[in-house]
From Swiss-Prot:
The lineage of its organism: Bacteria, Pseudomonadati, Pseudomonadota, Gammaproteobacteria, Thiotrichales. One of its GO terms (molecular function) is flavin adenine dinucleotide binding. The keyword Metal-binding does not apply. Homodimer. Heterotetramer of two MnmE and two MnmG subunits. GO terms for cellular component: cytosol. It comes from Francisella tularensis subsp. novicida (strain U112). GO terms for biological process: tRNA methylation; tRNA wobble uridine modification. NAD-binding protein involved in the addition of a carboxymethylaminomethyl (cmnm) group at the wobble position (U34) of certain tRNAs, forming tRNA-cmnm(5)s(2)U34. This is tRNA uridine 5-carboxymethylaminomethyl modification enzyme MnmG.
């Protein structure tokens, strides 16, 4: 049966990538269908109940700047907020929020259920409609065909998903859900490179069986920060509660070591590679054998939940062993496990087979986003979903495309890393992956991306006005401060010298004075004659950072300008690299396989030398491909 409602875009999967993809597509105005195997699990946090962190918080802020839903949802559902690295520079500060699982899912559903142009249908997708190497729709398990101009696959860990607890294995996309084996087989029949990855989750513990009095208490920040640029004054956070910290010990490690042969990972049952930066507890004990203890964050799953998430204890050991090692940990001596931990293995497809828009190179109008591309984490998934949804929508009746770059966002870094380097392990975002960290800060994500969001129609009128007002206030106040002078031996100078190490000897602008480490905006406000009445903390923050880091920011902007030349030089998709004399066989093979879209992208493919890029540039200039 064909269920034809004239959809422009179909999004398959209702996780974090799917929600952002469907929401972005619908906000742009495309008639969008979200197909999910279970409407009740849309927006579900399958693993840890938290959003953000180092590098990840940057992604959430960027999704928000483009009108996405993740930041607003966590503002509605967050039960503890912290700014990580708050004592360090602004480039590496990151927001992290503990979530109430129930409230988060409720918030996501509220946001997408009120989204115009978006329909939701419950059924598993078993097949794709592909005609002349172009996707035209999706076929569900019950035999319903939905046709559309674009299809976005955001299927998480469901493709060929296999759950492992010790030596017991069963098919599953996550605990309690069936895998998408038919769709996995269909995708394997298409010309994509495919491999297996693994991730895992810890056992959940009944909080009533835990002794918190022997653990370290970890409180959130006060005042409580917001994730979204648009939430303050409109969204009220839920009640805030603490998390706790405990540690493994030698007894814990001995129990794990003595039972390694029973672990699915160490017994050879699991083929896929797990996440390097979120290893299982058995992996930690083996890889860091010299460490006497490992930190465990004891995280509540919600205000009204009795479940605790012991972050740091992901495992594939048998349930009996899980019980033993959990009870060896301080505070967990009488712990009751409510759900066993498990590892899950699943198919992923080589992201080097994708364009920067996340459209596949082999099947036209088909987009991949999330764990199908080899990433791990809600934030990485949401970021990809956003880009895929945008491009699916804006290219319906044209050849328009938009994708972020390494110079304007962490989303750009994420996608560029994936499509140029690929991945052999679950990819996680860190600030260290970005070259231009001082420019790609959490605090200025809206200033970097929201103009484009306005242009694409991704922001609501209210959010658009909020952004424009903030941007104008920053521009106007910086201009005023650059044109306001204080001369020596004036009353203003004498008032200012209370905060300085020495007397002023020359005339300075307020902006130059703000560059000094001992001066901040609040001190300038104390000089009554200056009449500095600005109260908006977000605007003040941008003014201070612009002044204090102006030299570094200027240098990074110059670096970006140098590399922009290569980024702007497009390579045709049918370009014949064998015509370029002097390229080695290795370079020729890699360029032919990956089909980079620009010289900049080509330069970042592992094994592509500067000499090869020079030869390519000379040939393209000589033959008229570039000027």
């Amino acid at each position: 049966m064909i269920y034809d409602y004239g959809y422009d875009v179909i999004v398959v999967g209702g996780g974090h990538a799917g929600v952002e993809a469907a929401s972005a597509s619908a906000r742009i105005g495309a008639k969008t269908l979200l197909l999910t195997h279970n409407i009740d699990t849309i927006g579900q946090m399958s693993c840890n109940p938290a959003i953000g962190g180092i590098g990840k918080g940057h992604l959430v802020k960027e999704i928000d700047a483009m009108g996405g839903v993740m930041a607003k949802a966590i503002d509605m559902a967050g039960i503890q907020f912290r700014i990580l690295n708050s004592r360090k520079g602004p480039a590496v500060r990151a927001t992290r929020a503990q979530a109430d699982r129930v409230l988060y899912k409720k918030a996501i559903n509220s946001l997408i259920n009120n989204q115009e142009n978006l329909d939701i249908f419950q059924d598993s997708v078993d097949d794709l409609v592909v005609e002349n190497n172009t996707v035209c729709g999706a076929i569900t398990k019950t035999g319903i065909t939905f046709r559309a101009k674009k299809v976005v696959l955001t299927v998480g860990t469901f493709l060929g998903g296999k759950i492992h607890i010790g030596k017991v294995s069963n098919a599953g996309g996550r605990a309690g859900d069936q895998p998408s084996n038919a769709l996995a087989a269909r995708l394997r029949s298409l010309p994509f490179r495919v491999d297996r990855l693994k991730t895992g989750t810890p056992p959940r513990i009944d909080r009533r069986s835990v002794d918190f009095s022997v653990m370290e208490v970890q409180h959130g920040d006060n005042p409580t920060p917001y994730f979204s640029f648009f939430s303050k004054g409109k969204i009220e956070h839920p009640r805030q509660i603490p998390c706790y910290i405990t540690y493994t010990n030698n007894e814990t490690h001995k129990i794990i070591t003595d039972n390694l042969d029973k672990s699915a990972m160490y017994s050879g049952l699991i083929e896929g590679i797990g996440p390097r930066y979120c290893p299982s507890i058995e992996d930690k004990v083996v890889r860091f054998a010299d460490k006497e203890r490992h930190q465990i964050f004891v995280e509540p799953e919600g205000l009204n939940s009795i479940e605790l998430y012991p972050n740091g204890l992901s495992t594939s050991l048998p349930f009996e062993v899980q019980c033993n090692y959990i009870r060896s940990i301080k505070g967990f001596e009488k712990a009751f496990i409510m759900r066993p931990g498990y590892a899950i293995e699943y198919d992923f497809f080589d992201p080097r087979d994708l364009k920067p828009t996340l459209e596949t190179k082999h099947i036209k109008n088909l987009y991949f986003a999330g764990q199908i591309n080899g990433t791990t984490g809600y934030e990485e998934a949401g970021a990809q979903g956003l880009v895929a949804g945008i491009n699916a929508a804006i290219s319906i009746d044209s050849d328009k495309s938009w994708y972020p770059t390494r110079a304007d966002s962490y989303i750009g870094v994420l996608i560029d890393d994936l499509i140029t380097k690929g991945t052999k392990e679950p990819y996680r975002m860190f600030t260290s992956r970005a070259e231009y960290r001082l420019i790609l800060r959490e605090d200025n994500a809206d200033l970097r991306l929201s103009d484009k969001a306005c242009e694409l129609g991704l922001l609501s009128k209210e959010d658009q006005q909020h952004f424009i007002s903030k941007k104008n206030a920053i521009i106007e106040n910086i201009a005023m401060m650059k044109n306001t002078w204080i001369g020596p031996q004036t009353q203003k100078a004498r008032d200012l010298e209370k905060f300085l190490d020495k007397k002023m000897t020359r005339e300075s602008t307020l902006f130059d004075l703000l560059k000094r480490p001992e001066i901040d905006y609040s001190k300038l406000q104390q000089i009554s004659e200056l009449n500095l009445n600005l109260q908006d903390e977000a605007v003040i923050e941008q003014i201070e950072i612009s002044a204090k880091y102006s030299g570094y920011i200027e240098r990074q902007n110059k670096d970006i300008e140098k590399t922009a030349t290569l980024e702007q030089k497009a390579i045709p998709t049918d370009f014949n690299y064998s015509q370029v004399k002097g390229l080695s066989n290795e370079v020729l093979q890699k360029l032919t396989e990956q089909k980079p879209t620009t010289l900049g992208e080509a330069s970042r493919i592992p094994g592509i030398t500067p000499a090869a890029i020079s030869l390519l540039t000379i040939y393209m200039k000589k033959t008229g491909f570039i000027k």
